[in-house]
């Protein structure tokens, strides 16, 4: 049976841990609020860009020159670029583990193809480095402050590889932010690009040929998909960490209560034992 000193030391240790998890929860909540605002603010731009692109696509539906855009070229998927967006830190529940499992499952399902990785986030990078997979590029620290320029550079590199036919498809693996308690694991193909369809396309009057407009908008659309994915992932990571730290704080409180109850029982048993010894000694003296 542990002594009272050992139990008190254990309670003190759990309380210290509880303070850390509570502080991390508060920090994650503040970061989540900012990341959530940026994610929600970016969604209307992405929606409008898809709408405009859909209208342009309708205008060039019968234009053969538009169909020649290299970002629309469909080929047999023999060489695939898999962009995996994980977090830079742990203590976020199953956030990083689920992403890594999804990427590994994708590789297993495409065992006949050549998979090259683009790794965004320290956790994914560290995991796949040990597996000695083919890596096209790495990026660490982007989620701390998501910038369009950083994600656009990665998107441009992927588009360049696709245009040069060094790869046949580009897939993104990330967590889409739904709510504080819900993040959706998402696997989406961004290249070859698929033009959005408009149910009721607007008949715009274009100053430039629609095919030229398509050539301008399509790369922006791909860049926006990368940017949106990283924004969604950053918000999801903070939400997952906040939830995990809230759960850890609650578990610590329960453990402290149980240890305190156990300590009181041990102390009561010790006092009872001492009383019995005193009474027994007095009885023996008589």
UniProtKB/Swiss-Prot annotation:
The keyword Transport applies. SUPFAM superfamilies: ATP synthase (F1-ATPase), gamma subunit. It is a peripheral membrane protein. It is found in: Cell inner membrane. InterPro entries: ATP_synth_F1_ATPase_gsu, ATP_synth_F1_gsu, ATP_synth_F1_gsu_CS. Gene3D superfamilies: 3.40.1380.10, ATP synthase, gamma subunit, helix hairpin domain. GO terms for cellular component: plasma membrane; proton-transporting ATP synthase complex. Keywords: ATP synthesis, Cell inner membrane, Cell membrane, CF(1), Hydrogen ion transport, Ion transport, Membrane, Transport. One of its GO terms (molecular function) is ATP binding. It comes from the Bacteria. GO terms for biological process: proton motive force-driven plasma membrane ATP synthesis. Produces ATP from ADP in the presence of a proton gradient across the membrane. The gamma chain is believed to be important in regulating ATPase activity and the flow of protons through the CF(0) complex. Belongs to the ATPase gamma chain family. F-type ATPases have 2 components, CF(1) - the catalytic core - and CF(0) - the membrane proton channel. CF(1) has five subunits: alpha(3), beta(3), gamma(1), delta(1), epsilon(1). CF(0) has three main subunits: a, b and c. NCBIfam families: ATPsyn_F1gamma. This is ATP synthase gamma chain.
